Amino acid sequence: MAVHQQPATPFTLGTHLSEPTGAHASAYGTITRRTTGEPLGRTGTIHTPHGDIHTPAFIPVGTRATVKTLTPEQIRSTGAQAVLGNAYHLYLQPGADIVDEAGGIAEFMNWHGPTYTDSGGFQVLSLGSGFKKVLAAEFAGTDRDGEVRRGKERMANVDDEGVTFRSHLDGSRHRFTPEVSMQIQHQLGADIIFAFDELTTLLNSRGYQEEALERTRLWAERCLVEHSRLTVERAHRPPQALWGVIQGAQYEDLRRKACRDLQQLSLESEERGGVGSVSYTHLR
């Protein structure tokens, strides 16, 4: 993650959408940069309610609120500063409400440190549509934007409102929207959560990448609105910071557009007096 160039010590990371303000502001504090002499350096500190993260950081994946084969103490001994959980898997099993009742993902897994959760978008689309089969079909020269599983019912379908998918566990049907993703992630209670986005492959057409990029931008707007509402509604819980996702596949101009769009969304949110925001990376 890049930081934007400025002479002062504080800096902002390139994927923030929103950070708490007001009564919750002190829980996150200021992201500070270490003195390195490099304006685009990645060394700094992210302050969260459950501790600091010194970047660059080793953050292992604990998909179902556990890092396989390791206890929390063993995780810490590896030098890990935070753990990343998965909204999709925890929603399916054991359920976001159970994690919420336990006090959030950190309490649920007995991890005394910062936590992240992703939005579930990658898993909904990669597991729901058989991502490996997508790539295999595309490399074989089939229609890149066509049906993923020809002759079979697709397990994931994207529309402008969200994604309808079938569970990889039992085939049951579910629906994720930006609002649902925010609701699940607020129940999971991670310090840093991510906006819902659409997964594409590097072999999708340029036209589809542009369409998906715009859909992801609109979903980020909806995520920010719902995140703001839930932050007020759940003021008794520790605050959470919302980060955006930069898409655009292999197209640099699309990735730059994603950064600019999300930066603008952050600034607009701040002007509206919402939860608060910090700006995206300035691209040159």
Regions found by a protein language model. Give the residues of each.
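Glycine- and acidic
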Residues: T201-R206, E210, W243, G273-V278
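Conserved small/polar residues in nucleotide/adenosyl-binding loops
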Residues: T281-R284
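Non-catalytic, usually N-terminal nucleic-acid engagement modules in DNA/RNA processing proteins
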Residues: A2-A235
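Alpha/beta enzyme core
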Residues: Q187, L218-L242, G248-S277
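Structural preference for beta-strand elements that scaffold enzyme active sites
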Residues: A82, P114-Y116, I192-I193, A241-W243, ...
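Short, structured patches in soluble enzyme cores that scaffold and shape functional sites
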Residues: F194-E198, I246-G248, S279
